[in-house]
Every structure is written in structure tokens, then in C-alpha cells.
Amino acid sequence: GLCYFDNALWIRLEGGEGSVKAARELLGGEEVADQFWQQLREQQLPLFSLPGTLWRISLPSDAPMMDLPGEQLIDWGGALRWLKSTADDNQIHRIARNAGGHATRFSAGDGGFAPLPAPLFRYHQQLKQQLDPCGVFNPGRMYAEL
């Protein structure tokens, strides 16, 4: 694992004991317990309890920091960003799309998924109709119209 949060780079080394020890000696830094990674997995780090909306943003791993208000955590070597922000939904979707990714509102509420272009939305409608003709599986879960 590779994560940047709270002005610190967190690296989780995995593998055989000898390989991990050699990598640890080469990289240096502080050795910490697994607690950080467990708190990240369970969304118990301080970021997740801050006020604002929680966003899960998938981007190319080399995408730059997003210029948005709020706190960011960069995970998966840069490909996954957690953002706690009060920024406008459309602004977050636009910035994620312009960086080659997409944003999903993770906090409760409607409309968390990025708006789909009309042709792709029609495809989703047709697929949903084929797979769920009675409309019983998660109606309105991703998009109110589905």
C-alpha cells in the first residue's frame, strides 16, 4: 500500500520476511503498527469524521493534487482519493472528469454518482430493462431515473 495523508507518506511493505526487512532498511523511515491501515480500511481516520461531504474519487495514479477545499487522502499510489469537502457537487465531478477520472459521493444523499452523458445513460436504461424488467433491484440507487 502507498498512501499520502496528513503530510506523511505511508508505505505498507508486504512479502517474505527477508524481502520486507531489506526494503525497510533501504527505505528508512519510522516503522508503525498496522493500526493506520486498519483505520483507513474501516474509515476511522480523523478525515472521515470531519464536517462536509465524503467523496471517493478514482483518477489516474499520476493525476496532480486536486485544487478543492477540504481534506484529501491519496491512496492506491494516487489512483484513489478520499476527499472531505463542502465544495459543490458539480465542481467536484468536473475536476475529477477533467483529470481523467470520476467522483462518487460516499456520504448519504441522492445523486452521488457522476452524471452520465445521454448516450451512456440510454445504454444504462436499456441494460437495466433487460436485466431487471420489473424494476425490483435497487430502484433509483445510482440514478433516480433507473
Residue ranges and their predicted role:
Residues 1-33:
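A conserved active-site cap/scaffold subdomain adjacent to cofactor or substrate pockets
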Residues 6-7, 28-146:
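Conserved glycine-rich FAD pyrophosphate-binding loop
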